């Protein structure tokens, strides 16, 4: 799965 860092693309 993708790390939360990827979701932190805000």
Swiss-Prot record:
Expression by tissue: Expressed by the venom gland.
Calcium as UniProt keyword: no
Keyword set includes Transcription: no
Coiled coil: none
Keyword annotations from UniProtKB, A to Z: Secreted
Major localization class: secreted
GO cellular component term, pick one: extracellular region
Places the protein is found: Secreted
Protein function: Does not induce hemolytic activity, lactate dehydrogenase (LDH) release from mast cells, mast cell degranulation, and antimicrobial effects. In vivo, injection into mice causes moderate edema formation, but induces very weak or no change in nociceptive sensibility. It also reduces mice locomotion, suggesting an increase in anxiety, but causes no alteration in rearing (standing on hind limbs).
Extra remark beyond the main annotation: The primary structure of this cryptide Pep-3 is identical to that of cryptide Pep-3 from other Tityus species (AC P69940, AC Q5G8A6, AC P0C2F3).
Name assigned to this protein: Cryptide Pep-3
